[in-house]
Amino acid sequence: MHHPLPPDDTLYDQVRPILWTGHFLKLLDQRKLPFVVEYVECHSSEDVTQAIRALIVRGAPAIGIVAGWGAVLAAREIEAVDGIEALRKLEPALQRLHAARPTAVNLAWVLARMRRTLSAAHADWRQAMAREAESIAREDLTANRCMGAYGAALIPIGSGVLTHCNTGSLATAGFGTALGVIRAGIAQGRIARVFAGETRPWLQGARLTVWELQQDGIDVTLIADSAAAHLMKSGQVQWVIVGADRICANGDAANKIGTYQLAITARHHGVKFMVVASAATVDMDTTAGEAIEIEQRDPEELLGVSGVRTVAEGIAAWNPVFDVTPGALIDAIVTERGVIQSPDAAQMRATFGN
């Protein structure tokens, strides 16, 4: 633990996975972490689409930010006199970007923003798109710092926390959502212990979260996903803090597979459960979790580790990437607009409209 408390929590935020050079996009290849730190260059919208699909970039906010730059790159491949004509010509590329990861509502939200920008733009439509992409990234970082402060305020001094998947700088423009709350809680001296689940099958916790925290000098203990209940029973954890890829109008939240079972386990052991995500992740048009499209990935991902097969030939595997945690199991939803405790449809409506 770092006890000299920094006056500025930027000390705990050193990683940046998305770099726009002005000409092309550089993405930290998250498939190769933690042992290889390598950036992949994207020179076209198709490069960006493939990077999203291949999990070179992941995390709902980061996917949205990258899609914005993908739209900017697509704009270089067409000619148009104004934004309306450009939008008509760009629509196929925008739809391909959206199809790369359909569960992440941020992706659709960013593409909708780019469409609105184009609809209002004149001859300078390319510059308008670039300004919008920059704004999306800047707003995300600002929102994350805001969420960090709101979420940390809920955590008593001396608490232990458990997180799942990766919700930090690697998944956002910087600082992170759930990991941003943890960063803020560490900086304020509220959090005494941090645990991270490995997050099979892509091991985002083991490969990414613990590496990211290590870069920032934050002590973290890795656990097997299957050890979470025993950890909670031991009394070392007071809060589970996770992100979300989509939050419904009733407070249900879709997040990385394994989140739902953590919420059930937390409720049984009297451990609080916090979901941290930007307001862009809230989808008031989706009334409940049952309506969310759950992405299924290649079953082969479950049959080995880092390309080495560990399962006998001929075995079937089921590989949903997300699950849905009912709002009734969530103690707090934290966005940049504030905290919703014990979320339900009425509270969600009061905060997010519709």
From Swiss-Prot:
A GO BP entry: L-methionine salvage from methylthioadenosine
EC number of the protein: 5.3.1.23
One Pfam family it belongs to: IF-2B
Binding site for substrate: R58, G59, A60, R101, Q204, N255, K256
Record bears the keyword Isomerase: yes
Residues annotated as site: Transition state stabilizer: C165
Disulfide linkage: none
Keyword annotations of the record: Amino-acid biosynthesis, Isomerase, Methionine biosynthesis
Catalytic residues (UniProt): D245
InterPro entries: IF-2B-related, IF-M1Pi, IF_2B-like_C, Initiation_fac_2B_a/b/d, M1Pi_N, NagB/RpiA_transferase-like
Involved pathway(s): Amino-acid biosynthesis; L-methionine biosynthesis via salvage pathway; L-methionine from S-methyl-5-thio-alpha-D-ribose 1-phosphate: step 1/6
Known catalytic reactions: 5-(methylsulfanyl)-alpha-D-ribose 1-phosphate = 5-(methylsulfanyl)-D-ribulose 1-phosphate
Broad EC category: isomerase
Source domain of life: Bacteria
Family, per entry: Belongs to the eIF-2B alpha/beta/delta subunits family. MtnA subfamily.
Official protein name in the record: Methylthioribose-1-phosphate isomerase
Gene: mtnA
